[in-house]
Design a protein with these regions (language model features):
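Conserved positions in beta-strands of structured domains
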Residues: 65, 89-91, 120
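C-terminal boundary and immediately downstream tail of ABC-type ATPase nucleotide-binding domains
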Residues: 69-91, 99-101
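Structural detector for hydrophobic anchor residues on beta-strands
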Residues: 34, 85-87, 115
Length: 168
C-alpha cells in the first residue's frame, strides 16, 4: 500500500486515533505500507524504517530511533523538528571545530552551569515552552517546563551523553 501525506488534512483530534488504528491494522494483517510524509509523528511512531530524500536522492535510511538519535545531517535532523547546530568546542572540552546537532530537549536549564545564555523569547507548546536563547552569538532553542522572561540570563546544560553519541 502507498499513502501520500495521508493525514495532512485531518484535524489532530481525529488524526491521532486514525493513525493508530490504521497502522495497527496494517501491522496485524502484515501489510506493507510506504508512507510519503513531512510529518515526523507518522514516521517516528509507526515506521519500521525511515528513508529521507532530498532533491530526489536518498540521503538517509535507518530505523526511526537510530535516525532520530544519530542524524547524519542537519537536513535529516530538521525532519524531526527544531534542531541546533553548535560547534563542539563551544560546549565541551573538545578542541574539534566539528559541529554537533542537538534537539531542544537535549539542552536543559541549569543555574549552576558555566554556560550562560540570554533568553530571547518563550513559546508555549503543548505543556512545555520552547525557549529561544542567545548563546555565544548564536540562536539556540531548548525546552523547559516553565515560562522564562525575555532578557533573563540562564545557565544551560548540554547532555554529555548526547554529545558523546552524536560527536562520533
Amino acid at each position: 500500500m502507498l499513502l501520500d501525506e495521508p493525514f495532512s488534512h485531518i484535524d489532530n483530534f481525529r488524526k491521532n486515533n486514525l493513525r493508530r488504528k490504521l497502522f495497527n491494522y496494517l501491522r496485524e494483517k502484515n501489510i506493507t505500507c510506504i508512507v510519503a510524509t513531512h510529518d515526523s509523528t507518522d514516521a517516528l511512531s509507526f515506521a519500521d524504517k525511515i528513508l529521507v530524500m532530498k532533491e530526489g536522492k536518498l540521503v538517509a535510511e535507518n530505523p526511526p530511533k537510530i535516525l532520530y538519535n544519530t542524524p547524519p545531517s542537519k537536513y535529516v535532523a530538521s525532519f524531526f523538528g527544531d534542531v541546533n547546530e553548535i560547534k563542539l568546542d563551544k560546549i565541551s572540552k573538545s578542541t574539534s571545530k566539528k559541529t554537533i546537532l542537538l534537539y531542544p530537549q537535549d539542552i536543559k536549564i541549569d543555574a549552576s552551569s558555566k554556560y550562560k545564555a540570554i533568553v530571547k523569547q518563550a513559546y508555549f507548546m503543548e505543556g512545555i515552552y520552547l525557549i529561544e536563547v542567545i548563546f555565544d552569538d548564536q540562536i539556540l532553542f531548548l525546552q523547559h517546563d516553565k515560562y522564562i522572561d525575555s532578557n533573563k540570563t540562564v545557565g544551560i546544560h548540554f547532555s554529555t551523553e548526547i554529545i558523546k553519541l552524536r560527536s562520533n
